[in-house]
Regions:
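A short, conserved, highly charged catalytic patch centered on acidic carboxylates
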Residues: 1-134, 142-237
């Protein structure tokens, strides 16, 4: 049994994250060779590589078998492809969180190709028609949360979580990665990455830290009167 460094109430979320990655690895095993999965696990090839022939578009595969289920694992609800309120703007993020205090937009890229979406997520955040200071950019392996930078005139990464070591650990457990390809350090880091993912993205924790990170005047725009953790914000001005 994995000794998660989490409160007991968060154990189901951590197990759900681990199971999602395991299921994704098994889906990959139906589409790719073991050597290709090992390269994907260690980031030496992208799922968008033209030499890989999948039954889906690489971005759709990443979303359907990894990103959607990881969001579910941490109790985040979402709606696909929200549209800007202005008819003059034709920009469509891949999803928008719908059960968080702040409605966060998100962009998905194929596994190991997260940087390809950086310009897009910044564009979405610059649109006044999306009422959010935050955006998530992910390829399933790496999760970046963008928010206002210190100058207040742009956007920067506020939080960043990787799941590559967790992917490697689970692929090894499924006998897809060889014994020589995994160290005990990677295994320890894999468990830590799952823990960090839950602590960062579980809905209640996500609400708390995204609110705390905002300046008080902007935070007050989103903070409900009956928010359960409201007293914890008194020291954050």
């Amino acid at each position: 049994m994995t000794d998660w460094d989490l409160s007991k109430e968060d154990y189901p979320n951590a197990r759900a994250v681990r199971e999602t990655i395991r299921s994704f690895v098994m889906e990959l095993s139906d589409e790719c060779s073991r050597s290709t999965i090992e390269k994907l696990a260690f980031g030496t090839v992208s799922l968008s590589d033209p030499d890989l022939e999948l039954g889906y578009k690489s971005e759709d595969f990443t979303r359907r078998f990894l990103v959607d289920d990881l969001l579910d694992a941490v109790n985040l609800e979402y709606r696909p492809q929200p549209t800007a309120d202005s008819s003059n703007e034709d920009h469509y993020p891949d999803f928008e969180l719908s059960n968080t205090v702040i409605p966060v937009v998100g962009e998905i890229k194929p596994l190991n190709n997260v940087s390809a979406g950086e310009d897009q997520i910044r564009t979405y955040l610059s649109l006044s028609s999306f009422d959010t200071p935050y955006g998530i950019l992910t390829d399933g392996m790496e999760w970046r949360v963008y928010g206002p930078d210190r100058s207040g005139s742009g956007y920067a990464i506020q939080n960043q979580i990787r799941l590559d070591n967790a992917f490697q650990m689970i692929a090894h457990d499924r006998k897809i990665i060889s014994e020589s390809g995994l160290s005990s350090i990677i295994r320890q880091q894999g468990v830590s990455q799952i823990t960090d993912f839950v602590r960062t993205f579980k809905q209640e924790e996500f609400d708390d830290w995204t609110l705390i990170s905002l300046p008080k005047p902007e935070r007050d725009q989103y903070l409900p009167d009956d928010y359960e953790s409201q007293s914890s914000f008194e020291d954050f001005q």
